[in-house]
C-alpha cells in the first residue's frame, strides 16, 4: 500500500527502461510447477478413503453406544475430526454428536465429568464443549467459565505441572479465542492460560506430560486460532498425532489418522492441477515479462487454499489467485511506478472500460491495462454463467472504488500530505482490495447469490467491512514493524501520531493492534450468528481474513515470500505426507 512519506517518485517522469521491482523475483518457475507429479489422485486412493470413511462411521456408532463418558467422547471425536481436516466427511455424525451434547448443556454450569447425568462439572469437558458448540453456532454463554474461578475471582490451577491440568488449560485457551466483544471472562481466560502454557513450555518439570501434548501446546501458542487455517492445522496435527504412540493404540484412531493422511494427499494432488493451470495462465501472459511488480501468483493461491480447500471450490480458488495477482500489479503501479498524471489517466480508463485512453502511456502501463481488461472480462463472463445474470456493472463499480482509493493515496503522496487517521482508515479500507477480491470469488463459488444475500455478505455488509478492516490493520501493523528498521513509516501509524502528538510510534502501533483485537471479536460474532447467508460464503470471507494473519505473522509474506511463506507453500502445496 502507498506510504505517506517524502516520496517524489510520482511527481517526476519515470525512465521506462529502469522500471523494475525492488522486491525479489518469482520463486516458482512454471517448469517446476508443471513438473509436480503425484499418484495420490489415482482411483485406488479414492476408494481406500471412501472405505475408511465408512469404517470410521461404524466405529463411531459402536464406541458411543453405552459409553459411560459419552459427552466428552463425542466432543473429542468432533475436535479430532476438525483438527485433522476430515470433518467434511462426517458432517452428520458431528451434528448428531453436538445436538446430543447441547441437550445436556447447562448455560450456567456446562457439562459434567463422566456421563451426561454427572453432577460434578468438568473443566476440560465444559471448555471443549463451549468451543465446539459456539463454533457450530449453538447459543452458549461465556458465563459458564465463571464456574472455574476461585473465591478471588481468578482461574485456578495446582502448583504442580500435571498432564490432566495442562490439557485443561490448553482446552480453555482454545475456547477463549472464540470470544465476542465485551466478554471479559474470555479475556481473563486467555491471559491466564497464555501465561500458564508459556511457563509449561519453558519449565523444566514437565516429565509427567506427554510430549505430544506439549507439541499441541507449542502449536496453539505459535498459531492461535485466527492464524490456524484448516490446511495448516490439518498438516500440523497429522504430524503431531503420528508421533503419539499412546493415542495410536486405538483402532479407531489408527483409521482416523490413515484417512487424514490419505485425504490430505488426495486434496494436494487436486490442488497441484489447479496450481498448474494458474501458472500456465500467468506465464503465457504478456504481463509475465514485465519486471516492475511482485510476482506472487503461487503465494496468492496458498492464501486462499489454506482456508477454502474443498474440491467444489476450484474455480473460486483460481479466480482468487488471478485477481490477487492483478491487484498486486496495480498496487505496485500506483505505489511506485506511475506518475500522478499517468495514474489519473489509468483510473479514467478503468471507469470507461476503454483501452484507447492509455494509448499514449508507456508500454508497461498499456500492457498492464490490457491485462486488467482481459482478465476482468474473462472472469465477468464466467460470473455471468454461474450467476445466470450480467454482473458487469456491479463489478466495474467495485473496481472504480478500489482504484479511486489508490489514486487518493497517490495524490496524498504527491502533495506530501498526511491525512487524519480517520481519513486514512476510511480510504485504506477501500484500498485494501478485499471488496473486489471477495466479490469475484463469492460469485464463483458455484451457488446462486441473489442480490439480497449478496448485500449481506459483500459491501456494505458488516462482515465485509470487518474483513476489509482486518486487512488494513494487519498490513499496517506489520509494515510498521518491518519498515521502521529501514527508516520508513507505515501510513496508519504516522497518521495516528500526527493526530496524537503525545503518542510514540509504539503507542500508535499498540492502538492499531487493539483495534485489530476488537475487529477479530466482532468477526467471530458475525461468523457464528444466524442469518440468511449460507455458511460457505461466511466461511470464505472469514478465512480470507484469517489467512492474512498467518501470512503476516512474521513479516509481510507477500513482500518477502522467500522465507516462512516458502516453507508454508512446500508444507501445504508441494510435499505430500508419508
Swiss-Prot record:
Cofactor comment: Binds 3 Mg(2+) or Mn(2+) ions per subunit.
Domain of life: Eukaryota
InterPro entries assigned: Isoprenoid_synthase_dom_sf, Terpene_cyclase-like_1_C, Terpene_cyclase_plant_C1, Terpene_synth_N, Terpene_synth_N_sf, Terpene_synthase-like, Terpene_synthase_metal-bd, Terpenoid_cyclase/PrenylTrfase
Subcellular location field: Cytoplasm
Renumbered ranges of motif DDXXD motif: 331-335
An example Gene Ontology biological process: diterpenoid biosynthetic process
Gene3D superfamilies tied to this protein: Farnesyl Diphosphate Synthase (1.10.600.10), Terpene synthase, N-terminal domain (1.50.10.130)
Record's catalysed reaction(s): (2E,6E)-farnesyl diphosphate = longifolene + diphosphate
Protein's name in the database: Longifolene synthase
Organism of origin: Picea abies
Amino acid at each position: 500500500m502507498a506510504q505517506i512519506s517524502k516520496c517524489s517518485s510520482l511527481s517526476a517522469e519515470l525512465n521506462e527502461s529502469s522500471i523494475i521491482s525492488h522486491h525479489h523475483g518469482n520463486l516458482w518457475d512454471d517448469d517446476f510447477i508443471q513438473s509436480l507429479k503425484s499418484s495420490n489422485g489415482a482411483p485406488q486412493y479414492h476408494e481406500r478413503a471412501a472405505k475408511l470413511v465408512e469404517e470410521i462411521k461404524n466405529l463411531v456408532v459402536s464406541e458411543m453406544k453405552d459409553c459411560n463418558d459419552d459427552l466428552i467422547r463425542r466432543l473429542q471425536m468432533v475436535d479430532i475430526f476438525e483438527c485433522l481436516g476430515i470433518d467434511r466427511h462426517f458432517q452428520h455424525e458431528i451434528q448428531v454428536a453436538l445436538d446430543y451434547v447441547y441437550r445436556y448443556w447447562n448455560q450456567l454450569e456446562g457439562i459434567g465429568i463422566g456421563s451426561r447425568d454427572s453432577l460434578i462439572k468438568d473443566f476440560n469437558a465444559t471448555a471443549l464443549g463451549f468451543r465446539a458448540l459456539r463454533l457450530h453456532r449453538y447459543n452458549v454463554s461465556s458465563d459458564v467459565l465463571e464456574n472455574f474461578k476461585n473465591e478471588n475471582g481468578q482461574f485456578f490451577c495446582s502448583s504442580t505441572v500435571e498432564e490432566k491440568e495442562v490439557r485443561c488449560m490448553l482446552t480453555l485457551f482454545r475456547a477463549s479465542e472464540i470470544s465476542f466483544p465485551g466478554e471479559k471472562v474470555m479475556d481473563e481466560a486467555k491471559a491466564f492460560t497464555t501465561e500458564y502454557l508459556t511457563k509449561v513450555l519453558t519449565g523444566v518439570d514437565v516429565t509427567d506430560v506427554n510430549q505430544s501434548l506439549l507439541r499441541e501446546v507449542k502449536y496453539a501458542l505459535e498459531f492461535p486460532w485466527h492464524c490456524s487455517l484448516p490446511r495448516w492445522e490439518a498438516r500440523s496435527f497429522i504430524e503431531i498425532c503420528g508421533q503419539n504412540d499412546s493415542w495410536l493404540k486405538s483402532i479407531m484412531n489408527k483409521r482416523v489418522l490413515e484417512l487424514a493422511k490419505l485425504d490430505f494427499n488426495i486434496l494436494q494432488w487436486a490442488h497441484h492441477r489447479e496450481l498448474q493451470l494458474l501458472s500456465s495462465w500467468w506465464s503465457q501472459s504478456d504481463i509475465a515479462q514485465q519486471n516492475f511488480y511482485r510476482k506472487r501468483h503461487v503465494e496468492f493461491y496458498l492464501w486462499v487454499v489454506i482456508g477454502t480447500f474443498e474440491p467444489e471450490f476450484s474455480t473460486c480458488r483460481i479466480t482468487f489467485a488471478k485477481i490477487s495477482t492483478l491487484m498486486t500489479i496495480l498496487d505496485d503501479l500506483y505505489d511506485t511506478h506511475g506518475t500522478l498524471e499517468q495514474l489519473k489517466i489509468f483510473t479514467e480508463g478503468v471507469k470507461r472500460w476503454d483501452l484507447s485512453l492509455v494509448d499514449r502511456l508507456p508500454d508497461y502501463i498499456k500492457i498492464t491495462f490490457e491485462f486488467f481488461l482481459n482478465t476482468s472480462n474473462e472472469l465477468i463472463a464466467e460470473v455471468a454463467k454461474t450467476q445466470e445474470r450480467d454482473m458487469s456493472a456491479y463489478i466495474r463499480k467495485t473496481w472504480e472504488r478500489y482504484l479511486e482509493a489508490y489514486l487518493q493515496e497517490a495524490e496524498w503522496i504527491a502533495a506530501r500530505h498526511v491525512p487524519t487517521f480517520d481519513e486514512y482508515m476510511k480510504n485504506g479500507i477501500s484500498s485494501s482490495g478485499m471488496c473486489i477480491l471477495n466479490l469475484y470469488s463469492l460469485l464463483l463459488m458455484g451457488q446462486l447469490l441473489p442480490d439480497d444475500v449478496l448485500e449481506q455478505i459483500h459491501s456494505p455488509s458488516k462482515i465485509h467491512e470487518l474483513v476489509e478492516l482486518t486487512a488494513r490493520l494487519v498490513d499496517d501493523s506489520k509494515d510498521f514493524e518491518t519498515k521502521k528498521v529501514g527508516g520508513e513509516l507505515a501510513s496508519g501509524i504516522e497518521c495516528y501520531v500526527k493526530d496524537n502528538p503525545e503518542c510514540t510510534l509504539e503507542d500508535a502501533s499498540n492502538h492499531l493492534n487493539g483495534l485489530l483485537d476488537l475487529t477479530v471479536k466482532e468477526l467471530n460474532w458475525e461468523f457464528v450468528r444466524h442469518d440468511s447467508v449460507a455458511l460457505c460464503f461466511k466461511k470464505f470471507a472469514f478465512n480470507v481474513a484469517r489467512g492474512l494473519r498467518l501470512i503476516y505473522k512474521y513479516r509481510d509474506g507477500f513482500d518477502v515470500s522467500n522465507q516462512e511463506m516458502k516453507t508454508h507453500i512446500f508444507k501445504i502445496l508441494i510435499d505430500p505426507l508419508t
